[in-house]
Amino acid sequence: TKHRDGYRPETERFRWDSRDQLTGYCSAQGELWEYRHDASGRRTEKRCDRKKIRFTYLWDGDSIAEIREYRDDELYSVRHLVFNGFELISQQFSRVRQPHPSVAPQWVTRTNHAVSDLTGRPLMLFNSEGKTVWRPGQTSLWGLALSLPADTDDPDPRGELDPEADPGLLYAGQWRDAESGLCYNRFRYYEPESGMYLVSDPLGLQGGEQTYRYVPNPLRWIDPLGLNKGASLSKMMNSSSDLMGLRRQPQNFWRLYRGKDI
């Protein structure tokens, strides 16, 4: 339970299972969201029956490859994502459109490519013509939103940015949940407001002495699985895989150099 005091106090409720996976969230407005996971702990679905919205997730290893959105039990959009490790390379977004009731619905597809910083965080998306179609809003060092995507130092007076192009990523491996403000980080949930994880590290003390800590510096370090911080992504992935009993990553896996060398 998360409670905020004030003139209009608010209470948010979270439900966790025995594996410390978030299975339910109730907002201060009474919206109930349900989350489902597969046997490997990967999120496969989130839904809100009150809003008649449902998202399904298709995985490629530990990276999300496809997100489908359903509204009123009908497929509304499909987002395909291509990663180099945990760095977004490109995405293809398709949505059904019906400009007029007399016209049959048609699927419209747009392909965009990403530019990321040294940690793999998306900085912008551009189309095949080289025009910027999306960029993130301002955030604090730990990812807390300080502005909307269109409310930045470089405004969008012509309305050229596309909100639907937002891939939904914060830091490497972190997927933003608009309903709760949390970020789904594979094995755990990250809270940008505090810069901490909500549950203890599944690795215990093997992941570090501070089991709720994210990373020392998000500008130099990443934790795409929510297990342990790392500067060399391939080394970190193999270390986490060994501890969890999973298959090791290949030697040419996407690599990020040590933070002190960046």
Name every feature range the model reports, one short phrase each.
Residues 102-186, 193, 219-221:
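A motif-centric feature for acidic-aromatic and gly/ser/thr-rich catalytic loops and repeats
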Residues 1-111, 133, 148-167:
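Acidic/glycine-rich beta-solenoid
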Residues 144-148, 152, 188-198, 202, ...:
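Short, low-complexity export/processing leader segments characterized by acidic and small residues
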Residues 14, 35, 55-57, 80-81, ...:
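A residue-level detector for well-ordered beta-strand positions
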Residues 230-262:
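Catalytic toxin/effector domains delivered as secreted proteins or via bacterial secretion systems
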Residues 18-19, 29, 40, 61, ...:
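Residue-level recognition of short loop/turn positions
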Residues 29, 173-176, 261:
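Short, flexible loop/turn elements at secondary-structure junctions
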